[in-house]
From Swiss-Prot:
One of its GO terms (cellular component) is membrane. Belongs to the FAM187 family. Residues 19-377 are extracellular. Keywords: Disulfide bond, Glycoprotein, Immunoglobulin domain, Membrane, Signal, Transmembrane, Transmembrane helix. It comes from Bos taurus (Bovine). It is a single-pass type I membrane protein. Residues 399-421 are cytoplasmic. This is Ig-like V-type domain-containing protein FAM187A.
């Protein structure tokens, strides 16, 4: 009996030893800060969200402060946080065109920037409230305005590398996205950003490869950046086919209740995804966004049973497109017509997640508001028209006055011929 008690006590003691608290390794203790401040190069596309970690800091520093400079040595430096590092921003509250100080967040010493814009390009510093810097980034936000779309199914090839002496300009592609639809033919694409290779880059910037940085990096001298300005980002698109994941079947009891409620007739329409209803005035524009989608996600759009493929509906494929998908995965409908009514389904990462039932109403009478962008655009066109008419009217009268003053105007009055007797 004593032997049994001893065995139990030894087992209990061993179990207690197994539950010792293991302290998590502190990354700041094993990551020394560089003795000479270098800049890590990073490139993103417009409207992307990205994170800049602060991998090193002294142990006595409990909170970091992020700083921003447009150019190295600039006298104007933005402080991107309060001096306690407690600024928080929800990504869902960020809109396109929001100020930079609204589109960022500090979490666990890292800087998060939402929906980045080209004007956000520059230098980001992680440091203290006293202005001591630990780590720095060279961020290049490339615009999607002139983005070149390449469709592999049509036999198109990406842009070729450009050579200007020792300067090489090329495109670096990201990984392929997942197929944007399942069960039917879908599409997948990869984003390509502009990079260059040159021996004339600043040595203070850390390169991804030897002498290779993004085209908008601060390491690129101004004369080299001008040569690479015509090389736009690329979008490579190809077809794909992916099976749908099997979803759990509805329980038989739930289906029995559903059949009982719907009685013996036709069952009511039950949407497979959440549907949002929206009414739009005839002739006005509309932009639909897919919930939770980002530019790097695989997003697709359908109208009822029609698939809106990028090979036909991507922005820039046809200059006169009224319905198109931009490079940020938004669906645009310009000058809404009655035939635009229907349900628009949104796919994200190969799964259909939401629908938008669009209704189109006749214009009728509605109060004019100067906050309406279409009202402002119409007033702007009217003012430009009046200004052109005024300029033409004044120019004609000035010309006539000059003619009469200097007496060199031709006489355009018809001459009357005398009748011959």
């Amino acid at each position: 009996m004593n032997l049994a008690h001893t065995t139990v006590l030894l087992w209990a003691w061993g179990s207690l030893q197994a539950f010792e608290i293991v302290e998590k390794e502190n990354i700041f203790q094993r990551t020394p800060c560089p003795a000479f401040l270098m800049f890590d190069n990073a490139a993103y596309l417009t409207d992307m969200s990205f994170e800049l970690p602060c991998p090193c800091k002294p142990e006595e520093v409990s909170a970091v402060v992020w700083y921003y400079q447009k150019h190295l040595g600039s006298s104007h430096t933005k402080v991107l946080t309060d001096f306690d590092g407690r600024v928080l921003t929800e990504a869902a509250q960020v809109r396109v065109g929001s100020d930079m100080l609204v589109r960022f967040s500090i979490r666990m010493f890292s800087l998060l920037v939402f929906r980045a814009q080209p004007e956000d390009s520059g230098l980001y510093f992680c440091g203290t409230r006293k202005g001591d810097y630990f780590y720095a980034y060279d961020v290049d936000i490339q615009s999607s305005e002139g983005m070149v779309a390449t469709f592999k199914d049509q036999g198109q090839e990406p842009l070729e590398d450009e050579y200007h002496g020792s300067l090489r300009v090329f495109t670096t592609f990201w990984e392929w996205t997942p197929c944007d639809r399942c069960g039917v033919r879908g599409e997948q694409w990869r984003i390509g950003l502009c990079y260059l290779q040159s021996p004339d880059l600043s040595p203070r910037y850390r390169k991804i490869l030897p002498n290779v940085v993004s085209c908008g990096s601060r390491a690129v001298p101004r004369q080299l950046r001008a040569k690479a300005s015509d090389h736009n980002p690329e979008l490579l698109v190809r077809s794909c086919l992916m099976p749908c994941e099997k979803k759990k079947k509805v329980q038989e009891g739930v289906m029995a209740i559903f059949n009982y409620v719907s009685k013996v007739g036709s069952r009511p329409w039950l949407p497979q995804v959440p549907i949002q209803f929206h009414q739009q005035r005839l002739g006005h524009g509309l932009i639909i966004s897919c919930p939770g989608a980002r530019p790097e996600h695989a997003v697709a759009w359908d109208k009822d049973h029609q698939y809106l493929y990028r090979t036909q509906y991507l922005k820039g494929v046809n200059g006169s497109m009224r319905v198109f998908i931009d490079h940020g995965n938004h669906l645009h409908i310009r000058f809404t017509q009655l035939e635009d009514r229907g349900i628009y389904y949104c796919w994200r990462q190969g799964e259909r997640i939401a629908g938008f039932r669009l209704g189109v109403t006749s214009p009728g009478r509605y109060p004019v508001s100067f906050s309406d962008p279409e009202t402002r655009a119409a007033l702007g066109l009217i003012l430009i028209g009046y200004m052109l008419i005024t300029v033409i009217f004044i120019s004609i009268h000035l010309c006539r006055c000059c003619c009469y003053l200097f007496r060199f105007c031709p006489n355009f009055s018809p001459r009357l011929s005398r009748p011959q007797l």
